[in-house]
Every structure is written in C-alpha cells, then in structure tokens.
Regions:
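Extracytoplasmic gate region of multi-pass secondary transporters
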Residues: 46-47, 246-307, 358, 362
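Helix-breaking motifs and short loop linkers at transmembrane-helix boundaries and internal kinks
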Residues: 58, 90, 111-117, 128, ...
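Conserved MFS/SLC helix-loop-helix module at the cytosolic interface between two early adjacent transmembrane helices
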Residues: 77-116
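Helix-to-loop junctions at the C-terminal end of transmembrane segments
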Residues: 78-90, 302-315, 400
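Cytoplasmic membrane-interface "Motif A"-like loop-to-helix N-cap segments
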Residues: 87-99, 311-324
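Cytoplasmic helix-loop-helix junction between adjacent transmembrane helices
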Residues: 121-158
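Glycine-rich segments within core transmembrane alpha-helices of 12-TM secondary carriers
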Residues: 153-175, 196-197, 382-392
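C-terminal transmembrane helical hairpin of 12-TM major facilitator-type secondary transporters
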Residues: 316-364
Length: 435
C-alpha cells in the first residue's frame, strides 16, 4: 500500500478514484435503492388498501390515521439502537435482517380484523423496519465523499418516487382481485407486495460489502483510494466517534426539527392520497393509481435535478427551503380551491417539491458528523422526524372525521411547510465542496 501511494501521480489517482466511485455506485446504489423502494411500498401500500379495508373492517378515518401513524412511533423508538447495532454487526447482516422481518410482517397485515390488531401490526412493522433508512445513509457515508453525497443519496432515494409509480400502477389490479380464493383485494395487496421483501433480504445478504477495505470487487488501488479519500475529509465539529458530543450539538436537533416538519407533510398527505384524489375527482381506484404513478415520475426527476444542482454548487439550505416554500403554496391551493384538476395539479406540485428536497436535506449531517457519531446523529434526527409520520396521518384522520372532508387538513399543512423552511434557513453548516 505504501509503495502504491508513493508511485501514484495526481492524474493516475484521479482515474483510480473515478473507477472506484463508478464501481461502488453501480454495485451498491441499485441494491440499496431497490431495497428501500420495496420497503417504502410496504410502508405506504396501506393508503391504497384503505380504500377497501376501511369499509370491510368498519374503520373510521381516525382509526386508520392512528394505526397508520403507529408505524412511525415504533420506528422512532427503535431507530437509534437499530442503527448502533448496524454499526456493530455490519450493514450486510443488519439490513438483510430488517428486510426479512418487515417482509413477513407486511404479509401478515392481510390477517388484520380489528382496530387493536391493526394497531399492533403497524407497530410491529415499525419495529421491524426501524433503522433501515438511516442505516443506509450511514452506510453510503462510509463509501462516498461528502461532496458527492446529495447526488448519491438522490440516486438511492429516487427509489421512493419510483416505488410510488409502481405501486400506483399495480394497486388497482391487485385490489380488483377481490374475492379470488376467498380473499379481499386489500389482502392480496398486502400478500403480494410483502413477498418481495422476504426474497430480497437474501440478495442483500449475498451482495452487500460492509466497508471499502473489504470489497474484493475493487482493485487494491481502488480500495486504497477510497479508504484514504474518506479518512481525509474535514468535519466541522470534530465529533468523530464521540456519540455524546454529537447528540449535544444543537444542529442535530435542528435538522431533526426540519425532518419533523418534512415528515408531517409527507405522511399526512401520502397515506391519504388515494382517498383525497378519489374524493376530489370521482375517479376509480385504477385511474387514481395512474395519477399517483405520474406524480412519482415527476418526483423522481425533481429529486435527481435538485440533488445534482446542490452538489455542483455545494449549497444545501436553499435547495431545501425553496421546495418547502413552494409546497406551502401548493397545499394551500389544493385545500382552498374545489376544481378537481386544480386540486390534482396542486397536490402533484406539493409531492414533487416534497420529494425534491429530500436528498440535500439528508446530506446535511455529513458536513458535521462522521463515524459512530454520524450513525447515532442521523438516527436521532430521523427519530425526531419520524414523530411527524405519526402526527400527520393521525391529525388528517381526526380532521376528516370531524369535518367530513380533507380540505382543512391540506390547508393545515401550510404550517409545517413554513416552519421547515424557516428552520432550514437558520441552519449553520459548512458549505460542501462543489463538484
């Protein structure tokens, strides 16, 4: 290794670095993106299942919203320990374990009959999935330099809007299996969308590599370059391995507050989106599914474009705050106006902005955390944020039951959008190197 470092000139090092990053990107990002896309489908397929399930099981909007949100309470409670266990046992073992257990529980949702069973299964699903997303973000930080991180995260994270596209396309046909083999359409949806998680857990187990130094699919020079490049990166606060110091950093909790606002808007809308769109347009479930699919494709383009520009300029805050502001206006328009296609357009814009701000937002912690402190810091931020995943859908359900419509809930989402923009602009972090 020492001889290699001495002989390698800057031009050769740049070529080795490009090759290493290209191989890592093509090896890891598709694997993790597909895993996260499957997870996201299992997390929010309940939004389509509810179109039949709530009627069959006599669930009110408040019961549905509370149960849907309990997933995030469990996720938040278990996230920090799960992410620390990932750091201890390695990403390959821990992420594969997460996928296996959540896949089995996602399939088990088909057996729900009462509100208590619904609450219990959603809670257990949150326990099972806890740590997957922050674990992946930590894992990517172990492989890619900070200057590329928003772009890398967006390529992984683009699985989220694309999974919405796939879910929108398949939900209608699955729900139309109503009565096949004596099962309701919503039961088929849970069964057939949970099975891929179980199967893909084996793929992660076989193909992931914990750290660059262990990657036998890289050359010796490429492994050496990645290890040295990542070890040489500057960090604002120098937390390193000091978890306690990282958790005392107010920026950790400020980013957590931004995530809280973000996830409140995300799941208040997305877990009710099919019902809102069906009510606004009068369309059937298949047509509503295609509306969701179209929004997913637009969101994927926005995510990649915003993340790429953020990396090229090295700027993070405005790439998060501006989408928050546009989203605020879009929710207000969707809630205050009644013209069906104006509502659809407003909600599509809100979704696109919501998805578009994610990668720059998630890239921020890498500017002041690293190592075990990053694992704990990201998990702590996401834990705070995940409470928005509980509050958003529950509040939307309560408002729907009391007013008979979703319009008031949509207008209320202006508040977390505005607060999220303000917290973002008040954040003080080192500007990332442009690339």
């Amino acid at each position: 290794m020492a001889e290699f470092r001495e002989l390698l000139n800057p031009e050769a090092a740049a070529l080795v670095g490009k090759a290493a990053l290209r191989k890592a990107s093509w090896r890891l990002i598709p694997l993790l993106g597909l895993g996260y896309g499957i997870a996201y489908m299992d997390r929010i397929n309940i939004s389509f299942a509810s179109l039949q399930m709530n009627r069959d099981l006599h669930f009110s909007a408040a019961v549905y919203g509370f149960g849907a949100g309990l997933f995030f309470v469990a996720y938040a409670a278990c996230e920090v320990p799960s992410n620390l266990l990932l750091h201890r046992f390695g990403a390959r073992r821990w992420l594969a374990r997460i996928m296996l257990t959540w896949g089995l529980l996602a399939m088990g949702m088909m057996f729900v009959r009462t509100p208590v069973e619904f609450y219990a299964m959603r809670f257990l699903l949150g326990v099972a999935e806890a740590g997957f997303f922050p674990g992946v973000i930590f894992y990517l930080s172990e492989w890619f330099p900070a200057r590329l991180r928003a772009r890398v995260i967006s390529r992984f994270y683009v699985a989220l809007p694309l999974s919405s596209t796939v879910m929108g396309a398949v939900a209608g046909p699955l729900l139309h299996l109503q009565g096949t083999l004596g099962l309701a359409g919503w039961q088929w949806l849970f069964l057939l969308e949970g099975l891929p998680s179980v199967l893909f857990s084996w793929v992660l187990w076989r193909l992931l590599t914990d750290k660059p130094k262990d990657a036998d699919w890289l050359s010796v020079e490429e492994r050496e370059w990645l290890v040295r490049e990542l070890a040489s990166e500057p960090v604002d606060s120098g937390h390193g391995e000091d978890i306690g110091k990282a958790l005392r950093d107010p920026r950790v909790w400020q980013v957590g507050g931004i995530m809280l606002c973000y996830l409140t808007t995300t799941y208040a809308y997305q877990l009710s989106a099919p019902a809102i769109l069906q009510r606004a347009t009068g369309l059937g479930v298949t047509a509503v599914g295609w509306l969701v699919s179209g929004a997913g494709l637009a969101g994927a383009a926005a995510m990649l474009g915003n993340a790429t520009h953020s990396d090229r300029t090295g700027e993070r805050r405005w790439h998060v705050a501006v989408p928050f502001m546009i989203m605020m206006v879009a929710f207000a328009v969707s809630g205050l106006l009644r013209t069906p296609w104006v509502v659809v357009a407003g909600l599509t814009v809100a979704y696109v902005c919501n998805v578009g701000l994610q990668s720059p937002m998630i890239a921020v912690p890498g500017s002041f955390l690293k190592g075990r402190s990053m694992a704990a810091g990201i998990a702590a931020m996401n834990t705070v944020g995940m409470m928005g995943g509980f509050l958003g859908p529950w509040a939307m359900g309560v408002v729907k039951d009391h007013t008979g419509e979703y319009r008031v809930g949509l207008v209320a989402l202006v508040v977390p959008s505005l607060v999220g923009a303000g917290l973002t602009l008040g954040l003080r972090v080192r500007r990332a190197s442009s690339s």
